[in-house]
Amino acid sequence: MKNKHITPARRTSLELLNKILVSNKPFEKIILSSKKFLSLDDKDKRFTRLIITTVLRKFGQIDFIINQFIKKGSIKKNNLKNIIRIGIAELIFIKSAKYAAINEAVETTKINYSNRLSKFTNAVLRNIDRDKEKLSSMITDEMNYPSWLIEDWKQTWGTKQTKEIINYFQKEPYLDISVAGDPQEMEKVVKGKIIYNKTLRIDEIINPSKLPFYQTENSNYHWWVQDVAASIPAQLLINSDKIKIVDLCAAPGGKTIQLLKANKKVISVDVSNERIKILEQNLRRLNL
């Protein structure tokens, strides 16, 4: 049967989620080695990432919700459980249209299993949607972390700071970029905010390739994706002379680019061939 009813993003999300949860391989490695994911258009890539990261980030809460409606161990097929997990992620957290989220989960179950199990998926998700306000009041972000880790954080940082850590990790990550030129000028150009030295934060969730000057010969407008914390170690090395620098786990290349822009010589190493290709692409984009 052709899976004509299932959008490419949801179909790919299920396939990748299945691999992530059984392979014990890094999220990015599985994503970047997936021909299906790489063949998606930008919109579907973003939605696929959103679905998968939401399921992973809210995993404990999602499984708590499942356990309110299904006896533990009653779903023998992990693939089916992941279909329901994606449906819950869409209904409760992503706020997808109810019809789209439920209908596509039902169709996916029908294609992968049977009409009988598709009715099961339909019943579970409709019950969850009906009770979603009550369920939302029952779940906490702490459910997404092992209890031993929560206790360790509380002993180390205290209860208040632990809550702040959890809240931070539950948010969609910001997009930080480092700039080669004047950060105040680039702040206006990319509509970001200077948060440290030459690091700008873009609050909008956006594909970096859509930002101004993604491709430019003018080195004054060069920028690259780099978390603010990742920029600090390289900053400490920039004023050091006559040192050899090896950047381990270098991809996607933020620290390498930062050091090359400061006229340092760098040996960049990464265990992943896929990520090395991304590093090379980023270096070529900036004529390095």
Residue ranges and their predicted role:
Residues 1-288:
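S-adenosylmethionine
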